[in-house]
Amino acid sequence: DLQNVDQVFIPIFSAEDGFLLDYAQKLIYNNDSKIVVLDCNDQIKNNFIIKNAVDSLENNYPSNMSLLTNKVIEKEFLNQHDLMIISLESWKKLVDSQSDWLSDIPSVLIVKP
């Protein structure tokens, strides 16, 4: 049950997921949410535009924004969050991969660009 959107994580699976950072900015600005961006497959490190957007958010909102590069997602990490925001294409890939952590994810907002 989604009660709050205080703790949100956003996995970035591909370069096309960069638009999700707009949602991160809005949640920080309007709700003072704490955002964790998960860099899957080194997408942020290898994409100049996404990296700049993440760096800008980290500089402007250092207490609200963090970047995580772990490849393994633990149940404890998922339990700390209220919401996951993911693109439709990445959601499809995640479901197709039958990832172990799917059963433990919090509420999900699936967004199409």
Which residues are covered by each model-predicted region?
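Intrinsically disordered or low-complexity boundary/linker segments at protein termini
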Residues: D1-I49, E58-L83, L88-P113
